[in-house]
Swiss-Prot record:
Biased composition (Low complexity): 1-11
Annotated region (Disordered), positions in chain: 1-25, 395-447, 491-513, 867-894
Molecular functions per Gene Ontology: chromatin binding; histone H3K27 methyltransferase activity; histone H3K27 trimethyltransferase activity
Protein name: Histone-lysine N-methyltransferase EZ2
Primary localisation category: nucleus
Signal peptide start and end residues: none
Compartments where found: Nucleus
Entries under Gene3D superfamilies matching the protein: SET domain
Keyword DNA damage among record annotations: no
Location of the SET domain: 746-861
Amino acid sequence: MASSSKASDSSQRSKRSDQGMGKDAAAASVVPIHANLTQLIRQVQSGRLAYIKEKLEVNRKTLQRHSCSLFDVAAAAEVASRGTDGGNALSQRAAERQCGSDLANGIGERDVVSVQEENLATGTLALSSSGATAQRTIVRFVKLPLVEKIPPYTTWIFLDKNQRMADDQSVVGRRRIYYDTVGNEALICSDSDEEIPEPEEEKHFFTKGEDHLIWRATQDHGLNQEVVNVLCQFIGATPSEIEERSEVLFEKNEKHSGSSDKIESRLSLDKTMDAVLDSFDNLFCRRCLVFDCRLHGCSQNLVFPCEKQPYSFDPDENKKPCGHLCYLRFPQWREGFKEMHDDGLAGGATYTMESGTASQRVDVNVMYESEDSNRQKGNIRSMTLVGTSGSKIISSVSAEESTTTPSADISETENVSSDLPPSSLRKHKISKHGPRYREHSPGKRQKVFTSDISFEGNIMNKLSIPEIRDTRLESRESGGDKLRILDESTKKTSRKDMCGESPATTMENVGRQSNKVSSTKNFLESTLSCWSALERDLYLKGIEIFGKNSCLIARNLLSGLKTCIEVANYMYNNGAAMAKRPLLNKSISGDFAENEQDYMEQDMAARTRIYRRRGRNRKLKYTWKSAGHPTVRKRTDDGKQCYTQYSPCACQQMCGKDCPCADKGTCCEKYCGCSKSCKNKFRGCHCAKSQCRSRQCPCFAASRECDPDVCRNCWVSCGDGSLGEPLARGDGYQCGNMKLLLKQQQRILLGRSDVAGWGAFIKNPVNKNDYLGEYTGELISHKEADKRGKIYDRANSSFLFDLNDQYVLDAYRKGDKLKFANHSSNPNCYAKVMLVAGDHRVGIYAKEHIEASEELFYDYRYGPDQAPAWARRPEGSKKDEASVSHRRAHKVAR
């Protein structure tokens, strides 16, 4: 027992000693920091004193010079005033002498004039005067008509579209100033004591000396908790403020350093697409297609659709070259791309080529190789080229690749011409017993050597790369010169072969051209490696948007960076156009071909079974019941339901129970990320002509406007077709349920109302249910609307309009002329909340036929105790007694 107690005592002593040593070490580490900071403070204070003394001396000298200049100006002014006073004294004495002589002569007497008033008749007055010049004047009064004053109103800002309230415009938590209508006295009061804001904590403002102290301390000892705690003792600031200030100082010094200049001088092409689009994603609104959207705000949640645009390739015959460097100007590229995107390659293909005066036909029986050979080798088997005379034409072959050809194939095949178009450069196995082969060579069996030929060499031999090279890169210029020589030599060889050279001479040419093909391949690798990270990302984005259209990609995304032929070259050699087939050569493309393959896989996975049956798109059945939820239309009919704010969902494929749209009871819109075949997605209408303004239209029945992107027959054209947009219909028909979207409002005039204050008047006559305009304003919360409503009640005005469960429209400060339309129990207009492109908007419509210059009224739906005196119904009228009251005198759409 004694030994155990001694052991425990020794262990406790050791722990205490360790803790004491730890505290001593911490204190020892703090001591030098404290001493260094004390020395730094002394240096800062001494420097501060020297700076103050120097500043005082400079100020003293400046003040002395300024005082001397003011003294000189004052002295000059005094001398000038003395000379002026002397002249005035002489003239004053002369005037006094003249006045004395006049008094001596008796001229100083004044005439006494008396005026007498006499009322002759109503509205007239006679004035008579007595004296040396007696006169009588008759004055007639004119009564001016009474003109009422213009109704007072504050300045307002016109809005053609709703905007969200700015954060600094809120009245919640602020003391308001009210004006007493009787005594015109300003009263500062608040609705409740809870609205009085609590005093904010004062922030510490750092001086130059404190900044110098923080910078030196962090540079010498680093920024850790011990240094921050010691700095808090010398500087009256919190640790968080010191850490923030140190970061600011670090960034400020980084900008002035030389390394930051080098970083900023780098080209933006080295950045990736995500880094470049960082500010774009924060500022650009994908729903309104504008920057700095005032309606949806910045930094929105990015929602990308799961279904991407299908890859398409327009026929080259229907396209025009986009410029002098367009791939369409080179027939070899045109044929190559046409063959790349031709889906009917199961049978033979025939090409006609011209070289000098000779004309040949290429007959190919296509049969794909195995996947193993395609993965091991990215090269393409050649084809048989037969001349009109039946002679065999020999092509150039890569030496290193011809050695890998099986002997069985060599015994039965022979090399063919390299003048084939790139379109024919696929891995094909040539059948020597095809029917077309015997047709062109009757009675004579030909032997063809099968060889693997590099498709890069064929492309570069037929295309003069120096015409499209980038003059900014010297390496590419030198490579282009080499390719010009290769091109010329290849053409000479082709002519000789066509004239019928011997097989031995032809094989020598093959050996020479194999080296040229390898040099061409090296140049191609350097050309493809010149693509920066941003250019590659832009190219992939162009593939996603425009498909395999190098013209549109170069024009819209790579303008000034790459030409059309360079994009086509990269597209062909990188295997983007063949991404759907296992025939890619990844020796050059590398990971970027895999990225494009990922794009294709995502696109194929996004397509549902409904689009994959029988190899063609299946038409969806549109009915008025499939447009959305029937319950939405039922709630729309009564006019008393509260609309729900829409927010796009980011669901992939089909929406489930966790979908935010389904949870809130709204339909998925075109801005959602879900599939087009989602059961919760609103599919628009396919109404016939002039049916979109009836209850049979699912859009109109659901209080929605038709969307040209969703509805089948409701489309808009605003051009002549020069930009590829659809032409206008010949009958001039246009959907009548897109007035808010197209802003086709009537002309509204502003004038004095016969009811109260200002009023809105229609300029031209309108018919029943015609769209008049939109009620715009600020989008505020319901809490903000309650606070503002108390202020508006004091001014006996109402500009609040219930929009949905999240926002209220306030047109007091910002709005349009329809905000002046007054309330009436027997209105000629009505307000209706419509869903336009995912946003709720208030439209004003004519309830009946309205003549020109007639004032507009609509029912605010006041409660019995909320309507002002001028808006109350006359006694005995019991119409609409059951009007629904919405908060504080808010306007409500039916």
